[in-house]
């Protein structure tokens, strides 16, 4: 990626805008003031802007918002403006003008924020939609890439695989429509997590717009902010423009497989054994586990289906040998496996049977009402415990659990290396997914999810019960803006330490330095304490 040459040239003008008074525009409303503020650059740097007067406004707003819970006409306040930047200067100007005229700012890269925090607000707001901010520049020789924040994971996978002739990859999530900006800034893991760690572990540079409209990179932002955006949620500190990442070696041919087992076929014993194997296998082997429910042959009776999904960086012969040595009970056979490229494996896991070009399709995802929760498991669950889980699980309406094994590279990285702390000692992550199509079922579905999550508490991490930032869950707690900043911080620790453990206080420190007035905020954003030094010292918290 080549940095935008206009960025530094307009910075001084942006600073003047930020600190000048709104009366200079001689307008009668914040709406007009904001438009006038943007219009200064219209002739030289046209800023794509949409208001409710545009016929495409509603379509654009809903286009990449994935969760119908936050698209109800009665529950969602729409933005005053939608900005679709194509230049870095567009983002700079939008940040400065939004702050100047008292408008909240939301930034949407892929729309997969499961609590809608990237595209809804309780206050008048501007939304930056990065749908047209998607340049990807791959350097095969150096095994690096500059990726703009609006790019989807599928676009990254396709381009990296195509340009490297299937010799390079990027370790990140399974869903190809997820936006890179938010995914990497929260950690990001998928089928290469055991081999290479998180997506955020591959970051070697970044560009971000600060609250004052300045563009910073790794060298100019300083080590604390650079640390914070790689797993602490970049939207807490600014608007992430682009990442520079390391690309990782992958074998030209990988092996994939999927095996389904019901309770009647011995799933309980296999899931129990999986807990002792999946995080200890050779790091080239990934075996993810998905649990769903299915009807049995008996009317009204359900069972649990455990689906074991394999990715192996190598050929079938070697995978069969490893499985025979480590997990023969699963019974993996040659005809269960398929050899393909690493890029093709992403189509296989997500929408089997589609052509590889499917990874470029950002619009295929069916919208639904959605609730997600998460856990980390540090001790294997007993067979008796699993049986208790199944009894409650079949009471849900088509729930899903995704168990992602760790170990390997994840055990080798310190929990303080980045804000993401869930490293050595965690056997696997659990993602709980509730998915429904009828809004009238929302209360029932949410109550079941919360009840099941409560039951699972006995089997998962404790003190704190940890959670994954990219699976945001407002049930864990929200910011209280009606109290002092110190009390707000104390309340935020209830959920902040679940996501970040002992890294939460350092994130508060960074937030307090770079955004002391809390412009970049949402219901679960990092709270600043402008006088954090004295107050944290008073309760003997060492940052």
UniProtKB/Swiss-Prot annotation:
InterPro entries: BBE, FAD-bd_PCMH, FAD-bd_PCMH-like_sf, FAD-bd_PCMH_sub1, FAD-bd_PCMH_sub2, Oxid_FAD_bind_N
Domain FAD-binding PCMH-type: 75-250
Cross-link (6-(S-cysteinyl)-8alpha-(pros-histidyl)-FAD (His-Cys)): 112-175
Region forming the signal peptide: 1-26
Assigned protein family: Belongs to the oxygen-dependent FAD-linked oxidoreductase family.
Keywords on record: Disulfide bond, FAD, Flavoprotein, Glycoprotein, Nucleotide-binding, Oxidoreductase, Signal, Thioether bond
Protein name: Tetrahydroberberine oxidase
Disulphide bond pairs: 37-97
First-tier enzyme category under EC: oxidoreductase
